[in-house]
A protein has these predicted regions:
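Sec-dependent bacterial lipoprotein signal peptides
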Residues: 1-25
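Structural signature of multi-pass, alpha-helical inner-membrane proteins
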Residues: 2-6, 27-178
Length: 178
């Protein structure tokens, strides 16, 4: 015959198991969360009635409206790595793409000479904030898989973006290798 003491012991075990995830989570709150980021590279396009393009405002100090295709041509899934590099008068971002991204970058740059790539980025712990970072002019075919541009952000924001995008890229490639 079971008594209340036996049931109480099982209840305490279940209570401890239920509280365990909360205790573990509270112990981890002191750890710094990994940065995360997202990248979308769009191509300039003519306005169309089909709704496949949209105007976006690039540059905060002197906004410029650029009409883009809604679907990005490149994302962080195509990226190998990103880095902040020294450039004349400041810094720039260098995005190095994988084989598929290199092919896409070459095809779109060759076919859209005289237009713009338009780069959107999101970064931070929650990736809630994001903005249009740049609209680099396409002056030649880019066959080396590297897109370099001066972003509309501070050096600190650029460092956060690069750390987050490299972490996101690492997670994507880790998932593909499993």
């Amino acid at each position: 015959m079971r008594t209340m003491k036996v049931l109480a012991r099982y209840f305490n075990i279940y209570l401890a198991l239920a509280l365990l995830p909360g205790l573990v989570a509270s112990c981890e709150t002191g750890k710094k969360k990994a940065q995360t980021a997202a990248l979308r590279v769009h191509i300039e396009a003519l306005p169309d009635a089909a709704g496949t393009s949209q105007p976006v405002s690039v540059l905060r100090s002197e906004p410029v409206l650029v009409n883009i295709k809604k679907e990005p041509i490149l994302t962080e899934a195509n990226l190998i790595n990103a880095k902040v590099i020294e450039a004349r008068g400041g810094f720039a971002l260098e995005l190095r793409f994988d084989e598929n991204g290199t092919w896409l970058l070459e095809q779109y740059s060759a076919a859209n000479n005289g237009q713009h790539f338009v780069v959107f980025g999101q970064w931070g712990e929650k990736r809630s904030e994001g903005r249009w970072l740049a609209a680099p002019f396409i002056s030649r075919r880019i066959s080396n898989g590297i897109l370099v541009f001066t972003p509309d952000c501070s050096r600190e924001e650029a460092d956060q973006f690069v750390a987050g995008i490299n972490e996101a890229t690492k997670q994507i490639h880790k998932g593909l290798l499993k």
